[in-house]
């Protein structure tokens, strides 16, 4: 047992499972804009000088893809231009992924006026970074630019009036912790399982915050008018008798409801995973719904949620930060692990469930963040339940089928090889289609 990894596992979860208000790609643009205008010293008067401010945004292709069609919290609009404008006018540079938590209606109106006067431009930067956003703010004779790269809150450069205020070599001094030691270069799923099952309960109880935040988002999504209303549609048709109740329907509806609200800009934070609110929802809500359906104890729920989130982080650690592979699918593999545990499965069954999921949903593409992501989230949640139930019955996708190997860790590596290799060209094709349709 590799107990020396346990403190690193805790660090990884506390780093990667954090509250986030709004889709994290446009939020990184809003954060950069908030920092840039703050550097110019006009933050408190930004809404009054809005027509004297111009903003230029340059982002990586992947960030453009994920920012084009997703709702920005509190604005009723989608896309990177409104994210940059509202971030500059009312963003809190110290709030990280919750940069927009304090915006008011008057701020939104000011941001919309900036867009109407064509004061915000957005383009694709020719950079190697998969996650990259540079925001430059112009005010009178002053300029300030802020660059975020590689992680959603990692500021690597700040420049004011042509002078560097922060260089990439100093980036470790920001509030981003992405440079921490990576325990997953040594870890296997066995180690993740051992930690989730045996770590002192008080050390991992904090993971219940994921349940609190994402369940509240689910309730909001099921009761409000958000996105494609996938969760609400499932609940409505269950009441009509067109769908039966039970574990699967409960998991699908509650998970989709949270994603509906998230992707349509609800002013409520999600507990994220690996820099994504949807991935946090996918790793949380299927486990929560299953635990409540099975009447699992609080201890079981805590361990299931920790197993789910840490497994999701482990699988994602092999992949690029952003890719053409839908992140909700990999996060839901964590949920499959958590559900299998709640159904009294052990490591063998958990491994089987993950392998079956990779055999099922590994081809789902990411074509940007948007309302329909809730469909992919619910589909992946359904696969998690299906794979868990199969595993409990001793059934799994075998090592003779497709990219699935007999060994779960090798199968996870195979999935990453696909995502980081051939699917990079898929990503290029997806963005080309999106920009020219």
Curated annotation (Swiss-Prot):
Disulfide bonds: none annotated. It comes from the Bacteria. GO terms for molecular function: L-cysteine desulfhydrase activity. Pfam families: SDH_alpha. One of its GO terms (biological process) is L-cysteine catabolic process to pyruvate. Belongs to the UPF0597 family. This is UPF0597 protein Shal_0864.
């Amino acid at each position: 047992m590799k107990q020396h990894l346990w403190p690193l596992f805790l660090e990884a979860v506390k780093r990667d499972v954090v509250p986030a208000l709004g889709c994290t790609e446009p939020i990184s643009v809003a954060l950069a804009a908030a920092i840039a205008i703050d550097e110019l010293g006009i933050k408190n008067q930004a809404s009054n000088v809005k027509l004297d401010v111009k903003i230029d945004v340059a982002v990586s292709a992947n960030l453009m893809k994920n920012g084009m069609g997703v709702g920005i919290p509190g604005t009723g609009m989608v896309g990177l231009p409104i994210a940059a404008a509202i971030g500059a006018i009312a963003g809190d540079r110290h709030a990280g992924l919750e940069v927009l938590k304090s915006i008011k209606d008057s701020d939104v109106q000011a941001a919309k006026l900036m867009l109407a006067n064509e004061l915000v431009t957005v383009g694709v930067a020719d950079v190697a970074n998969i996650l990259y956003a540079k925001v430059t703010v112009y005010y009178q004779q002053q300029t300030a630019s802020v660059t975020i790269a590689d992680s959603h809150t990692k500021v690597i450069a700040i420049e004011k009036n042509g002078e560097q205020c922060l260089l990439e070599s100093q980036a470790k001094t920001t509030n981003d912790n992405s440079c921490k030691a990576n325990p997953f270069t040594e870890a296997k799923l066995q180690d993740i399982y051992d930690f989730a099952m045996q770590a002192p309960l008080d050390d991992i109880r904090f993971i219940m915050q994921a349940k609190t935040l994402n369940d509240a988002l689910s309730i909001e999504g099921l009761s409000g008018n958000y996105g494609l209303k996938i969760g609400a549609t499932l609940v409505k048709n269950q009441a009509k008798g067109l769908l039966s109740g039970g574990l699967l329907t409960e998991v699908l509806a509650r998970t989709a409801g949270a994603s509906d609200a998230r992707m349509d800009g609800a002013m409520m934070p999600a507990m994220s995973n690996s820099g994504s609110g949807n991935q946090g929802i996918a790793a949380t809500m299927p486990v929560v719904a299953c635990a409540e359906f099975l009447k699992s104890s609080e201890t079981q729920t805590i361990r299931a949620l920790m197993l789910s989130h840490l497994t999701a982080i482990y699988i994602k650690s092999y992949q690029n930060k952003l890719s053409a592979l839908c992140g909700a699918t990999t996060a839901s593999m964590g949920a499959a692990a958590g559900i299998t545990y709640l159904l009294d499965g052990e490591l063998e069954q958990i491994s089987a469930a993950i392998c079956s999921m990779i055999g099922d949903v590994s081809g789902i593409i990411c074509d940007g963040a948007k309302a329909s992501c809730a469909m992919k989230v619910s589909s992946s949640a359904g696969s998690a339940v299906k794979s868990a139930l199969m595993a409990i019955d001793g059934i799994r996708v075998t090592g003779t089928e497709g990219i699935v190997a007999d060994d779960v860790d090798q199968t996870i590596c195979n999935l990453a090889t696909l995502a980081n290799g051939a699917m990079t060209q898929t990503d290029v094709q997806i963005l080309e289609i999106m920009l020219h349709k």
